[in-house]
Amino acid sequence: LKLKQIDGSDFDLDTLKGKKVYLKFMRFASCMFCNLEVNHLKNKHNEFGNNFEIVLVFHSSVENLKKQMKKHGPLPFTVVADPDFSYYKKYEIERSMGKLINSFIFKLPRALSAILKGYIPIKIEGYLDIATADFFLDKNGVVLDIKYSLKDSFDGFEFSEIKEFSLR
């Protein structure tokens, strides 16, 4: 996986060999649920183990992603842009309008929390109907576990699972 980071520099997933990685394919940069997740991961980052990295992939241009992530301040993990959707296809990330609708039905309290934090997607740049997906990679870059969204667009690993993986 080779993409641009929010500062415009190149990122290569292979540079993280030797570390465990939580790789998450998000939706578009202004997605309210995604921004809530970024905020949560930033606030809980000190609970993760050593030798562990988080990489978040957004279907967005670098410019838009940088603008949207600015509200979070400095982030202790890697955020990259895949404006062409190429790695989403390679990793078989699904697009589903049904799962998007289910997200608002099943995750209404989460949506309200995002709105209260000001994560309102005024400008949508990217596919609206991406069903997120989570990957745990071992120190050699081998996929250990995958969680594709099943019932809604944000059906990924729970925080407790991510934390446990980071501490193993």
Model segments located where?
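Short active-site neighborhood of thiol/selenol oxidoreductases, capturing the structured segment around
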Residues: 14-42
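A short, polar/charged loop-to-alpha-helix boundary motif
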Residues: 152-167
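A structure-centric signal for secondary-structure junctions around beta-strands
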Residues: 10, 17-19, 51, 131
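N-terminal "domain-start" segment that seeds a small globular fold
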Residues: 1-14
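Thiol/selenol-based redox catalytic cores and closely related redox-interacting motifs
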Residues: 82-153
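Structural microenvironment flanking redox-active thiols in thiol-disulfide oxidoreductases
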Residues: 37-90, 96
